[in-house]
Amino acid sequence: MRTPCACLLLLVACTPSGKQLAETGHPSPETAAKADADLAAAAAPPAPQLPPVAPELISHGRHDRKEIALTFDACSTREPSRYDARVTAALLAANAPATIFLGGSWAKEEVAQVKELASHPQFELGNHTYTHPHLPALKDESRIRAEIVRTQAEVKALTGHTPRLFRPPYGEYDQRVIRIAGELGLVTVEYDLPSGDPDAHATKERLVQWVLSQARPGSIVVMHINHLKFHTAEALPDIIAGLRARGFTLVTVGQLITALNPGSAAVGAAP
């Protein structure tokens, strides 16, 4: 579930779950069956083990600190895998930290890109499930667990590090999802500022105006790094410069969590 959206996102109405209409919709039985088959057929490396943490959902940091986290989803979809290197280049050029949530099957197809992302200390990598399903619609808890565990294994095999942060696809979750993530050692991370970059009307100018007008202390912004047609990369330099001009410090989600809960172990990635 998501907190109801209180505003019109760009020019597109939000659903009650807080997601844009263009980003929602349940998969057909055929698509769901294909996702099940993909997950079952994947040759999984050994799954890493993290100590369990208390079930926790984070959607923003402290409101009394002008810190903001830029996050990017690399979604696993039915379409061929994509990677927008311009997003990475914009972040590196601005020396901007970011948290990037990797889909497991996306990571399996984009091996070189995942390794490159992991090579930059300013980037924090998280888990975005293996096949990008609607998790609350999954009746079998073992399938929810498999989506997370399989991605943990994939990222660990490629980077040598195990994510401690988890973002459910489509911003959809229920108490089972948060609990299972905690049992696997991950904090569930949502957001309070959807950029709207998947929307067809989301031009560079609209993305910049929207993010800068809605940014608040502690905000977690969500964008995407897996689609070449989005205007995310074009907007990023102005978004980053605008946030800094307004006095914001860019941080990772892990740093936001540390400020909320000093000493938290559920931050960043584990060896």
List the predicted regions and their residue ranges:
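Post-signal peptide N-terminal segment of mature Sec-exported envelope proteins
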Residues: 22-50
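C-terminal domain-boundary segment and adjacent tail
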Residues: 50, 57-63, 230-271
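His/Asp/Glu-enriched short active-site or ligand-binding loop at hydrolase and phosphoryl-transfer sites
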Residues: 172, 178-214, 247-259
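Bacterial signal peptide processing site
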Residues: 15-18
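Solvent-exposed loop/turn segments at secondary-structure junctions
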Residues: 74-78, 104-108, 130-135, 170-175, ...
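C-terminal motif of bacterial Sec signal peptides marking the signal peptidase cleavage site
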Residues: 11-13
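CE4/NodB-like, metal-dependent polysaccharide N-deacetylase domain
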Residues: 89-102, 124, 141-174, 179, ...
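Active-site beta->alpha N-cap acidic-glycine motif
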Residues: 42-127, 131-139, 147-154
